[in-house]
Amino acid sequence: MVRGKNLFVLCCAMMGVWTAVSAAASVQFVDRAKALGIDMVNTSGATQEYIVEGMMGGAAFFDYDADGDVDLYITNGSSFAGFAAGQHPQNRLYRNDGDFFVDVTERAVVGDTSWSMGSAAADYDNDGQVDLYVTNFGRNTLYRNRGDGRFADATAVAGVGHRGWGTGVTFGDYDRDGDVDLYVANYVDFSL
């Protein structure tokens, strides 16, 4: 009897999986970014002639202003062709106001215009404020959250300004000592 009961449970479970797969096929996504205040054009190299032009950036979701709403930081690319003065693409920080996102990039002082690849957020200095690390094609940047809606460049002070080609980044307590550790993935070393 146990064998038959297990077979029945297995059959029911499989039917549930098939139902879930069928339901998932009908899911549709709708672009609501502009309606929610996120108005950004992500730039990548136009010619795709160089390897870096084929790479795009990322995003970090974190509560930078400690209001309980998850905010959004989006990295941007660049181009070797160059840009007119004041037209260079930059990374953006959008504050979540509950129903709408507000671009606070300039006030927060995180409008990095480097060729950014990735970002991650964590409280690296244990001051209760979530900080931000951005990887770039060039110098990476650590932004220390000042707690007043603005960030300060803490790259040199923290000694984490690698000038290679940083692509990915994450924070975690690797050695379990209670302090947040930083792990940066680099791509190509052009000096070889």
Can you name each region flagged by the protein language model?
Residues 1-11:
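Bacterial N-terminal signal peptides that target proteins for export
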Residues 20-192:
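Acidic, glycine/proline-rich Ca2+-coordinating loop motifs
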Residues 9-20:
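Bacterial N-terminal signal peptides
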